[in-house]
Each structure stands twice: as structure tokens, then as C-alpha cells.
Amino acid sequence: MLSSRAEAAMTAADRAIQRFLRTGAAVRYKVMKNWGVIGGIAAALAAGIYVIWGPITERKKRRKGLVPGLVNLGNTCFMNSLLQGLSACPAFIRWLEEFTSQYSRDQKEPPSHQYLSLTLLHLLKALSCQEVTDDEVLDASCLLDVLRMYRWQISSFEEQDAHELFHVITSSLEDERDRQPRVTHLFDVHSLEQQSEITPKQITCRTRGSPHPTSNHWKSQHPFHGRLTSNMVCKHCEHQSPVRFDTFDSLSLSIPAATWGHPLTLDHCLHHFISSESVRDVVCDNCTKIEAKGTLNGEKVEHQRTTFVKQLKLGKLPQCLCIHLQRLSWSSHGTPLKRHEHVQFNEFLMMDIYKYHLLGHKPSQHNPKLNKNPGPTLELQDGPGAPTPVLNQPGAPKTQIFMNGACSPSLLPTLSAPMPFPLPVVPDYSSSTYLFRLMAVVVHHGDMHSGHFVTYRRSPPSARNPLSTSNQWLWVSDDTVRKASLQEVLSSSAYLLFYERVLSRMQHQSQECKSEE
């Protein structure tokens, strides 16, 4: 029954085709021409509607408790993930607000497309819900446009690295800062010289226009700016060279080889970063002077070359700490490989044992009244109330391998042997002087040739308490945003870690005691 119906349908179709073919070439041409005209008109109408009204899609509104996503412009997940991470750092946004206030004083409507700081501030405030917007997805192409004005050629269709873009942004902000005047206008005394019959009490200073405020070089540094200390100790005479300071915007840590049965931690990476290394064939001026004292008649002595021990420490810790875990490695054949090991990190990070000590400074004695309730309760460091970096380390362990940025002389002969690193089992955050809180994590999925960047970040604080820190975490992948747990964040394979310095409970209580006095 079914086969007979199918045969009948095929026969009817064949008859229609045969009638169309017998109509003649002229009729067939007219029919095909009419269908072509109709198809062209339909395509033109569709194109016109798209140009005038855009794509026919509903603009979604952002769900409550989430942040806006960012549209992927081709391969811009590296930029989107970095912006989401930076927007979770309130200290960086406050610095941008203070830095860009100079433009609002100079002109009523500053062109934001000319300044990286203004463009970045606008994006970060929108991503941190500090600007009123109901859009679920934002466009960050303006950042690429302003970076091109700073002579950075960044394509939105080529895969880039989020860590490299971070340094592009920080270096461009420093260039913008250096273009600003660092001295005030000279006082205009010409009008004072023309007034002859006045008393000294009537003399006042007059200016042409408002003078620029004197710029403090250290105050204008962005919150990610820190300093490393590097010093060298001669293994022969134990002479210590002068300390050298180098700046950094992020700590790029290599991942040491894992030991079977022992997990890798962020503390292991930090210890590997500051661990001492031997530098051979270095001229020691002190050894040369000692050798010259034993010569007769002022004979010239060749420069004495010995082995030095080089030691790194953190001389100035920034307000916002960016840590980069180097996941690039090279095989024996010279091909790049990605390291997928999980590096354990915590929500809070104590940096006391990595801080540089000045010789002769002793740990300060805390008020015994402050030790009654030593708990992990923390207060966010904010503005002028932030503690001034000090040189004592009350939270450092009693047994230390390194002292004052150099190796202890008793350990110099045994530096080649690996030494255990004392890691606290249960860290006491209440006594830490340099304590940091995790704000965002950038994760890279894929290999060294292609992949995708996503971000774990804290949700912005509520409008009722804008100075608080939210405990809600978000997972952001370009324009997709969802809630995440802290356990999911700590289980991720971090590529970039963003920490922000906070006050420990002991420091907060100490400030309260001083204010009461």
C-alpha cells in the first residue's frame, strides 16, 4: 500500500517536470528570472533590517548577584579574564579613581579614549557593579583601541597571554603617569612688582590658574608595584655586598619538581623563588684588599675571584599582589609543553618569612592584651589606615634558614644540600604582619598552542556595605557568569593569582587601642 502511494507521487512529480520542460526556453527563462528577482529583493530587505535595527535578539538583563560578562571579539578571552580579575581588586580601582581625578580638574569632559586609566576605570567599575548598567554582556574593544594608541599592536583574532597583557597595562599606566608634570607652576610675581605702595603684610601670592599638585613619585605608583632585594655574600670572607633593589609588578614563580606523595603548594614555589644560588667566578673586593695587605712594597694583586651566594627577598610588598605560575616548560627536543600540576593555594597568604629584614631590627613586642582572642577574623586594609611596612617579622618561625636577606654564615658550607622548608601546619593569621586575601584566580584550559582563559573572582560587595568583602565566588568565561564555591576555586589549576593586602586581627586591635589613647 505504501509502495503504491510512493510510486504515484513519483509519477506526478515526473509529469510536472516534463510539462515544465515542454513549455519552451522563453517561458523557462521568465520563470527563473522572476524567482531570482524575488530572492534578491528578499536578501536586500534582510540586509537592510540587520543594518538598521541590528540582529533580532533580545537584550538580556543581568541576574541579581552576578556581574556583567564580556563579549569575545574573536580570541579575546585573555583580555576578558584579566579584566574580570582586576575588577575584583578594590584597591586598584581606588587608585585609578585617584589617579584620573587630575583629568577632571583640568577639563570638564576629558576624552576617555585618549587615556588608558580612564578607559580601564570605566570598564572595571562596570564589571564591579559600581556603575549603573543592566546589560548582561559588555564590550571591551575600547581597551584594545586605547592600547593601540600607546603603540601596542594587539590583535583580537590571535591568541594572546593574559600575563603579558597584564604587564602591557601596568607599563602603559607608568608611561601615562610619567607624562604628567611633577612640579607645581611658578608663582607669578609680575603683578606684585607693579604694586609699589603696599606694606609687607598686604603682599599675597597670586597665580595664573590653579597650580598642579606636587606629585609624589611613590604615592603615584600603582598598587601592584613592589620591590625585590638582591644581595650577595662571599663564601670565602663572608663579606656582604650592598643590597640592590629591583621593581616588579608581578611575581613570576617557577613550579619546582614535585615529590611523590607530597603535594605542591604556593609556599614551595615562593621558597624556590627566594632560595639562594651560588654564583661562581665573582670578583670580591674584600678578598682582594685582604690579599693586598700581605704583599710587600705595594705590589699589585690580581683581583680575587670567589664564589658568592645570591639571595632574593621582598623589600617592598605591594598593596595588590599578582602571582604568575610559570606553566611553560621545554622538552628534551625543544618543544614547548604545559605543566598541568595542581599547585595548592589558600584563601589567605602570609608573606612574613619572604620579607627582607634590616640587620639589627628585632621583632616588636605586641601588647599582651591583644592576645586574648587570636582568631582568623580580618579587616580589609583601606587607605590611610593601612599599616606602614615595617622591618620586623613577628610571625616568622624561630628557626630560619635565611637571616636578614642573606644566608647564615654557619650554613654557608652546606648550601649545596637541599634544606627542608618549615611550613606551618595550621597558620596563625592573627599574628601576620604581611597578610593577603585571595581576590581572583585566572585559569588556562588547553595546551601551549591553543586554549581558553576563565576567571574565578569574588562577587562585588553589597551596596549597603561597600567596604566589605564578599564571600561569594563567581566563575566567568567571556559572557557566561555563574556562581561558584570556594572549594571549586581552590581546586583549580591557577595561572594568575590576585591577592590584596588585609589587616590581621591583631593589627586591627592595635589600631583601635591607639585610637582610644
From Swiss-Prot:
Membrane topology, Mitochondrial intermembrane segments: 1-35
Posttranslational modification: Ubiquitinated by parkin (PRKN) at Lys-235 and Lys-289, leading to its degradation.
Residue(s) of cross-link: Glycyl lysine isopeptide (Lys-Gly) (interchain with G-Cter in ubiquitin): K235, K289
Segments in the Cytoplasmic topological domain: 57-517
Effect in UniProt of substituting K33N: No effect on subcellular location
Regulation: Inhibited by the diterpenoid derivative 15-oxospiramilactone (S3).
Free-text tissue specificity from the UniProt record: Expressed in skeletal muscle, pancreas, liver and kidney.
Keyword terms of this UniProt record: Hydrolase, Isopeptide bond, Membrane, Mitochondrion, Mitochondrion outer membrane, Protease, Thiol protease, Transmembrane, Transmembrane helix, Ubl conjugation, Ubl conjugation pathway
Record's subcellular location: Mitochondrion outer membrane
Transmembrane residue ranges: 36-56
Residue span(s) of domain USP: 68-502
Family per similarity comment: Belongs to the peptidase C19 family.
The protein's name in its UniProt record: Ubiquitin carboxyl-terminal hydrolase 30
Organism: Homo sapiens (Human)
